[in-house]
């Protein structure tokens, strides 16, 4: 048996040796690849589009008792800034039902297109001022400022400016639970939805929405009353996503002793968290702490002396936040301030009302701020230094303003004029696209 195994092993070794000799004598075969040829491909961004939500919506007629009556009242003024681009769809200077602005251009930012809508309201059941940026349609978003109870009316303005139908899912987050609602929108359709048809006697709620495929415009209109007296109106666009750091700019306290600003917090997470709230003005600093339970709200009255404040809300768990602020003069009105986006460069049109610019520096070092204010063909340049955790305010006069800095800043426009009060919280306008280098083998 051992002899047979040895014979098989010797035969295998001889075969392996012979195969190596044969392979060594075969001609070598080489494989060559073509020289890579880089191709430059230009990918242009889509036309930049923003949407203005339109004029004030009156529910129930002027008397408030006409069941099912929903009307747009008057017109909202449109203030467009157009940079080095061309309008595909011109928004015009007035709108009732809402309007689009669509432009082509290379510089995809507010330097290409920036639009604001504004409207003063004077009705038997509603007085005040509404203003907001006209923003890009979005696939999803949040609102913190919901209120649907006695003396508090909320109306959702939902528009589908696309050429495709879509389904919008609304999730109303109320203390102790949630209420779901779906709205189907045809291409180009606008839906006006009084929240009272869905929820009632909920003085506090947040809202999350999401679409089934195409971006939409969603705005929240609010009206406040006390008995037969009007207490103001407001128009808000979606807030930023819940975050562990919320930065709020342009809180002007002008009603000390009447109605304190109220900070609302919502914790969408599953664990409790403590919010550290810092309110800073030129002559006052207040630091507060507030526990926010999971899937719950907390409201904090900010006992602040009159002045201009920036607000920072920090937490270990992402929170949604906003401040409801009231002014007394020149008209009793309110506005919701929500977290601000950070910019290095921002261009805004200036509404034809008494408008102040607030710019805040939440960074650790001072920043240099450069302003370019245009009035017709005239341009005025100004520069300022803003210390760390400080805010700069300037009364504006002109058609548009460009704000630029090497460091990150936040900004807000505040209107306090005869019709009332509004805070305009800008957002970036941008579609992505650039030149690509593609290597083809």
Model-flagged regions — what are they?
Residues 93-128, 157, 161-163, 189-230, ...:
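Hydrophobic, ordered structural segments
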Residues 57-99:
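Extracytoplasmic/periplasmic/luminal assembly and interaction segments
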Residues 81-98, 175-206, 283-310, 376-400:
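Intrinsically disordered, low-complexity Pro/Gly/Ser/Thr-rich segments with frequent PxxP/GP/PP motifs
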Residues 2-64, 115-159, 216-268, 319-365, ...:
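Conserved functional hotspot residues at active sites or interaction interfaces
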Residues 155-179, 264-284, 360-379, 407:
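Short acidic, flexible loop segments centered on an aromatic residue
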Residues 74-77, 111, 154, 164-169, ...:
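Short beta-strand/loop motifs in extracellular/secreted proteins, especially
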Residues 239-307, 312-314:
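Long, internal scaffold/assembly segments composed of regular secondary structure
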Residues 82-86, 91-101, 106-111, 116-145, ...:
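A general "mature secreted/periplasmic domain" signal
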